[in-house]
């Protein structure tokens, strides 16, 4: 899977090691979910002002959030999360607020790398149609996220 990662914020330094970690965790998520072939995902790191604007525009919430996902294809309730159609497939865009991730990493007592990786996996699963609107959906997403992160050595 091809990952395009863009840092569009200047509040916090994001070095090559962190970018490599994000690519690695997205590749692990793709492998765990059976995403193969020429699939593509875009991950953009932004500041709170940028994500607040997106959140207001697309969700009607006038506040910053940690992660937003914009899937190119919406999944119905009975559709599989991912079905490889063969050929190129742009899954969608993941947008993460780095300042919010920094705050959350402090609150949860883990590294920024771990928090950004968690948010990237969370956003990726949303692109595949996973959601946490129900207790069962939330439990499934949580289990998948933790398994993927543990698989790349990013435990809580």
From Swiss-Prot:
Indicate where this protein is primarily found: cytoplasm
Q: Which GO terms describe its biological process?
A: rRNA processing
Q: Which InterPro entries did the record assign?
A: MetalPrtase_cat_dom_sf_prd, YbeY, YbeY_CS
Entry keyword annotation includes rRNA processing = yes
Localization, per the record, is: Cytoplasm
What does it do?
Single strand-specific metallo-endoribonuclease involved in late-stage 70S ribosome quality control and in maturation of the 3' terminus of the 16S rRNA.
- Its name, as the record gives it, is Endoribonuclease YbeY
**Organism annotation:** Moorella thermoacetica (strain ATCC 39073 / JCM 9320)
Q: Which gene encodes it?
A: ybeY
């Amino acid at each position: 899977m091809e990952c395009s990662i863009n840092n569009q914020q200047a509040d916090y330094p994001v070095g090559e090691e962190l970018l490599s970690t994000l690519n690695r965790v997205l590749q692990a998520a793709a492998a765990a979910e059976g995403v193969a072939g020429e699939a593509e995902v875009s991950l953009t790191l932004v500041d709170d002002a940028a994500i607040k604007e997106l959140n207001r525009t697309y969700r009607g919430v006038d506040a910053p959030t940690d992660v937003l996902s914009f899937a190119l294809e919406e999944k119905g309730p009975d559709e599989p999360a991912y079905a490889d159609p063969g050929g190129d497939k742009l899954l969608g865009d993941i947008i993460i607020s780095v300042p919010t991730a920094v705050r959350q990493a402090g609150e949860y007592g883990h590294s920024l790398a771990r928090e950004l990786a968690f948010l990237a996996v969370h956003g990726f699963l949303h692109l595949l149609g996973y959601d946490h609107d129900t207790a069962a959906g939330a439990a499934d997403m949580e289990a998948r996220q933790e398994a993927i992160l543990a698989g790349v050595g990013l435990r809580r």
